[in-house]
From Swiss-Prot:
Keywords: Calvin cycle, Carbon dioxide fixation, Chloroplast, Photorespiration, Photosynthesis, Plastid, Transit peptide. It comes from Lemna gibba. This is Ribulose bisphosphate carboxylase small subunit, chloroplastic 4. The keyword Chloroplast applies. InterPro entries: RuBisCO_ssu, RuBisCO_ssu_dom, RuBisCO_ssu_N, RuBisCO_ssu_sf. This protein is coded by one member of a small multigene family. The basic functional RuBisCO is composed of a large chain homodimer in a 'head-to-tail' conformation. In form I RuBisCO this homodimer is arranged in a barrel-like tetramer with the small subunits forming a tetrameric 'cap' on each end of the 'barrel'. The lineage of its organism: Eukaryota, Viridiplantae, Streptophyta, Embryophyta, Tracheophyta. It holds the Pfam family RuBisCO_small. GO terms for molecular function: ribulose-bisphosphate carboxylase activity.
Length: 177
């Protein structure tokens, strides 16, 4: 009993003492040291950083007439070999390839001003997801089959991670002419 009385009085004494230095109130990330008062004496503008004249070769993408769609749309059209490399990357990451197609290759709204199900965000899936696919040539063959069945439609390949339940990659495999 005496030992418990001693512990409670010691705790009361510890609480009554002044605040510790690490218990001061938060001071909103202010530094106690002011910024240096010295300024750069040189007002010469030639010392400013430069991108080395690369501005003259930069181009602005035209906002009309050349729509961009998916991940790789700023590249030139992908050849069959390029598509196979992308599908190999998709398969190496253990993603499930899926093929989708749509008449319109971009988001549009024709029925209502607010977003909805029929505004181009969801494409029609070509057959079923290719679970267990291990060869890029199988995916390319399905893309070719979709192109033959719907030559005026856009065809895209998506990579779905079935462990995390997310779509990880999506790119246009075929654009109609």
């Amino acid at each position: 009993m005496a030992s418990s009385m001693m512990a409670s009085t010691a705790a009361a004494v510890a609480r009554a003492g002044p605040a510790q230095t690490n218990m001061v109130p938060f001071n909103a990330c202010r530094s106690s040291v002011p910024f240096p008062a010295t300024r750069k004496a040189n007002n010469d503008l030639s010392t400013l950083p430069s991108n080395g004249g690369r501005v003259s070769c930069m181009q602005v993408w035209p906002p009309e007439g050349l729509k961009k769609f998916e991940t790789l749309s700023y590249l030139p059209p992908l050849s069959v070999e390029d598509l196979a490399k992308e599908v190999d990357y998709l398969l190496r990451n253990d993603w499930v390839p899926c093929i989708e197609f749509s008449k319109e290759g971009f988001v549009y709204r024709e029925n209502h001003a607010s977003p909805g199900y029929y505004d181009g965000r969801y494409w029609t899936m070509w057959k079923l997801p290719m679970f267990g696919c291990t060869d890029a040539s199988q995916v390319i063959a399905e893309v070719e089959e979709a192109k033959k069945a719907y030559p005026e439609y856009f065809v895209r390949i998506i990579g779905f991670d079935n462990k995390r339940q997310v779509q990880c990659i999506s790119f246009i495999a075929y654009k109609p002419t």
